């Protein structure tokens, strides 16, 4: 049913189906079509993507994202720029911290069993792979989604909009950020169904 409501694409060429991870990353089960990569990127560059979901390595106070350079290690941006620049909406998804983070859930609440060693939300990213300033200039909606908090880019900065049930805003979010996010009142609670091992009942 959900597959009739959306069509998932991967930069390697699959159109539709269920994208695979791990060693099978780039493939898809039951894909409707397989395009060659240049054709897939023509689709991206032409603005064919409604919603782009990408990884979250580093974010800063201006909404910039870095996925391309970390100290002496240069990962490069790959197709990241093509996908993000012409998508109608962009969502960056990943864990709130990195390096050993362990989480569990109980009774619809998130529990941080072991905090990550590295903060991902820092004052200034080392290299700008995605520009928050440019996104605001062109009116592109941007969200940053983690297991414990959701942020939104607005004209005057990054806002904390949602917090997972069971999470303390000060000690488990703000204390692990290199900047203080803006808040438009009390952040909403993320839907507790996300943190329960049962059918969500999506409509």
Please give the residue ranges for each predicted region.
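Conserved catalytic-core segments centered on acid/base and nucleophilic motifs
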Residues: 1-2, 52
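Short internal beta-strands
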Residues: 9-14, 93-94
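Conserved phosphate- and dinucleotide-binding cores of soluble alpha/beta proteins
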Residues: 19-201
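Short, small-residue-biased leader/transition segments that mark boundaries at the very start
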Residues: 3-8
């Amino acid at each position: 049913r959900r597959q009739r409501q959306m069509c998932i694409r991967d930069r390697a060429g699959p159109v539709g189906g269920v994208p695979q991870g791990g060693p099978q990353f780039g493939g898809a089960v039951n894909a409707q079509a397989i395009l060659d990569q240049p054709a897939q990127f023509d689709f991206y560059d032409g603005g064919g993507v409604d919603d782009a979901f990408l990884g979250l390595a580093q974010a800063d106070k201006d909404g910039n994202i870095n996925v391309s350079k970390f100290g002496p290690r240069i990962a490069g941006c790959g197709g990241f720029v093509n996908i993000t620049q012409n998508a109608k909406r962009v969502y960056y998804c990943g864990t709130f911290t990195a390096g050993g983070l362990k989480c569990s859930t109980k009774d619809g609440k998130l529990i941080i069993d072991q905090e990550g060693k590295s903060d991902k939300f820092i004052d200034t990213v080392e290299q700008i792979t995605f520009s928050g300033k440019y996104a605001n200039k062109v009116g592109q909606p941007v969200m940053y989604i983690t297991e414990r908090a959701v942020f939104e880019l607005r004209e005057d900065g990054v806002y904390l909009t949602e917090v997972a049930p069971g999470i303390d805003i000060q000690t488990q979010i703000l204390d692990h950020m290199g900047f203080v996010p803006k808040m438009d009142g009390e952040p909403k609670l993320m839907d507790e169904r996300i943190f329960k091992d049962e059918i969500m009942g999506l409509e």
